[in-house]
Amino acid sequence: MVQAWYMDESTADPRKPHRAQPDRPVSLEQLRTLGVLYWKLDADKYENDPELEKIRKMRNYSWMDIITICKDTLPNYEEKIKMFFEEHLHLDEEIRYILEGSGYFDVRDKEDKWIRISMEKGDMITLPAGIYHRFTLDEKNYVKAMRLFVGEPVWTPYNRPADHFDARVQYMSFLEGTA
């Protein structure tokens, strides 16, 4: 099962867990109030998984590809890692399914505090359009993930501040409704 927690304020190596002290775990229900959705799937059978197909159909995830993030295979690795870790939002949902390896998604809560979500093999997450977030590998420095999209893939990050976008305005309205 996925683990999530409030982060400390350290700016040291982002690949470390950065748990706040004392530990402040975050439940799946708390993540749902932020619009974050989570599924646990069998990554060994992702090519023929009826559960994944059901989710894709239900949420209209019609396009997918697979990305491997590691120093040996990803062109412009250092540049990409920095870009992924820059706080940003998207105008569409961000959907990732971890097939191998691990990493962290960090999302902002309603008080603008960072929550770290530890993602491992079999974890699938949907971040809502308009949520500020970032991604980093953990200390294993490797992840293979399926990227899913509704329609044609659009992966345009808008770095913070990006509060003027409709997706952000709608997301903030959603948060007010979950208070």
Curated annotation (Swiss-Prot):
Gene symbol of the encoding locus: Adi1
Keywords: Amino-acid biosynthesis, Cell membrane, Cytoplasm, Dioxygenase, Iron, Membrane, Metal-binding, Methionine biosynthesis, Nickel, Nucleus, Oxidoreductase
Region of interest (Disordered), residue spans: 1-24
Membrane topology (UniProt): Peripheral membrane protein
Cofactor comment: Binds either 1 Fe or Ni cation per monomer. Iron-binding promotes an acireductone dioxygenase reaction producing 2-keto-4-methylthiobutyrate, while nickel-binding promotes an acireductone dioxygenase reaction producing 3-(methylsulfanyl)propanoate.
Pathway field: Amino-acid biosynthesis; L-methionine biosynthesis via salvage pathway; L-methionine from S-methyl-5-thio-alpha-D-ribose 1-phosphate: step 5/6
Protein name (record): Acireductone dioxygenase
InterPro entries: ARD, ARD_euk, RmlC-like_jellyroll, RmlC_Cupin_sf
Chief location of this protein within or outside the cell: cytoplasm
GO CC field: cytoplasm; nucleus; plasma membrane
Organism: Mus musculus (Mouse)
Enzyme Commission code(s) on record: 1.13.11.54, 1.13.11.53
GO function terms (MF aspect): acireductone dioxygenase (Ni2+-requiring) activity; acireductone dioxygenase [iron(II)-requiring] activity; iron ion binding; nickel cation binding; oxidoreductase activity
HAMAP family for this protein: Salvage_MtnD_euk (MF_03154)
Cofactor dependence: Fe(2+); Ni(2+)
Binding site for Ni(2+): 88, 90, 94, 133
Source superkingdom: Eukaryota
Catalysed reactions listed for this entry: 1,2-dihydroxy-5-(methylsulfanyl)pent-1-en-3-one + O2 = 4-methylsulfanyl-2-oxobutanoate + formate + 2 H(+); 1,2-dihydroxy-5-(methylsulfanyl)pent-1-en-3-one + O2 = 3-(methylsulfanyl)propanoate + CO + formate + 2 H(+)
Any one biological process term the GO annotation gives: L-methionine salvage from methylthioadenosine
Reported function: Catalyzes 2 different reactions between oxygen and the acireductone 1,2-dihydroxy-3-keto-5-methylthiopentene (DHK-MTPene) depending upon the metal bound in the active site. Fe-containing acireductone dioxygenase (Fe-ARD) produces formate and 2-keto-4-methylthiobutyrate (KMTB), the alpha-ketoacid precursor of methionine in the methionine recycle pathway. Ni-containing acireductone dioxygenase (Ni-ARD) produces methylthiopropionate, carbon monoxide and formate, and does not lie on the methionine recycle pathway. Also down-regulates cell migration mediated by MMP14.
Binding positions (Fe(2+)): 88, 90, 94, 133
Species classification: Eukaryota, Metazoa, Chordata, Craniata, Vertebrata
